[in-house]
């Protein structure tokens, strides 16, 4: 026998070694569902308008400052490097208009939605929580005095929370698919600004859900910046090749101004999510209150 006392084992829900192991994965997944759900309920969030777009698009001020800096460094770098730096800096200045447009559109939407009589917050501007277009949309909503959501993702580069997210609605996800779930689940509208791989991934996933009618709601979709998107994606070629139906092009609208986009979104959101009560669809009874079209 020994007089040495055995230490108590850690409680399972406080055992970091277990929680961060493969065996604890299901609990981590449930946490990224249950914790956001709890906060959305507490913050009285009914539904959202999601903005997707590049983290690499800067404001006019930042882009012009960078261009001035590049011009000032001309004597310190090789001609080849200077040419490349100028090309990127000038492109950033050109793309900066999308930052300002996202900011303007988010402000218009928030000013309108804040006037909707409802028990919960309607059509809350939501982004991926990072810089670029995400920052611009959160900024516009913040300037309008509304709540605004950031669904951030833990990455080794590029992603950090912008300062315009409502602090109590700032989220950090480990799993991409859980983050995507919350984008899709609460969204009643989607605005896609110019972006790269991440934006395309997010857009096409929700577009596919809408096209296959896997969403138990009508989602209003705007592709912002027709010149950019028509250069990046040839939707007409997909129709001509028989890969999609011509009617699939009605799933979204191309737009080039904040005011035009706002009117389209307002009309669609009013028609599908603020109008007279429509017949329930299969699965409506299982939808938590925060995600329903009407309280």
Model-inferred region functions:
Residues 3-151:
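Glycine-rich beta-alpha loop segments
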Residues 41-44, 116-120, 142, 162-164, ...:
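Solvent-exposed alpha-helices and their adjacent loops that cap or buttress functional pockets
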Residues 66-69, 142-143, 205-210, 237-240, ...:
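Short, solvent-exposed amphipathic alpha-helical segments in soluble enzyme
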Residues 121-124, 217-221, 249-252:
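Residue-level recognition of the N-termini of beta-strands and the immediately preceding loop/turn
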Residues 126-193, 197, 204:
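Phosphate/pyrophosphate-binding betaalpha-module
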Residues 145-158, 193, 207-231, 247:
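Short, acidic/small-residue loops that bind anionic groups at enzyme active sites
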Residues 223-295:
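C-terminal functional extensions of proteins
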